[in-house]
Amino acid sequence: VTKCLIDKISGLYAGDELTFRDKLASGIDNKSRMDTLEVFGDRVAGDAQADPKHHGGPDRVLHHFPREHYGHYRRMGLITAGQDAPAMGENISSVGLTEADIHIGDILSFGEVELQVTQPRSPCFKLNHQYGQRDFALAMQQTGMSGWFYRVLKPGIISCQDALILKQRRTDISVAEAMKLYFRPEFDAAAYDRLLSCEGLAASWVGSLQRRLERGSIEDWQMRLYGPDSLALN
């Protein structure tokens, strides 16, 4: 299966300065437009991560966010007219490719680089502070308009002129379906088993799904969605 998903992306972004908002370190709104990105096995050259445990590492080297989602979030009243790519902290912006079109485990070629889709973005409370909206992370979780992460199978250079090509499809679970299965509020062992069968799924998601099955319950999402009480927005 070789299929051109996008013949030209909208933008590539990276930034190495961390900014502070509400006393929180973040690399989310420091990204600048780049003509090319140099991609390594565990990082993008010139791209900083304030919280590598949750937003970096080998399973989350590149974040791809569909640009059309900005319009949806504007219509929901969650972001302003001036907020556009790369305000979600994305490295790759495109139009015409969404979470429904990409599957967990997909292997893609992009310029010199070979990538594998590992997980949807797990929305966290830093988004609430980024946009001054108490429930932004929850809205992203519920709508599924989160974008997705790639691991790097073959490093190299990518350019804005490069096409994104699907080389192999390894699973039948789209990023959109993975969001629904993972963030369903009711415990669902069958759904977790299905996700765990996905080749290429990020190790952090594998671990959390296995813990759910061992405990027979879902972890508390309050801290991820809203942060500590001292930082919660009213």
Question: Where do the PLM segments sit?
Answer:
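Loop/turn positions that initiate beta-strands
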Residues: 105, 155, 159-162
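Short hydrophobic beta/alpha edge segments that flank linear recognition/processing sites
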Residues: 163-167
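A short pocket-lining beta-strand/turn micro-motif at the edge of beta-sheets
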Residues: 35, 146-148, 160-162
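Active-site glycine-rich loop that binds ribose-phosphate moieties when present
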Residues: 131-138, 142-152
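Electropositive, beta-rich accessory/interaction domains or terminal extensions
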Residues: 1-129, 135, 170-234
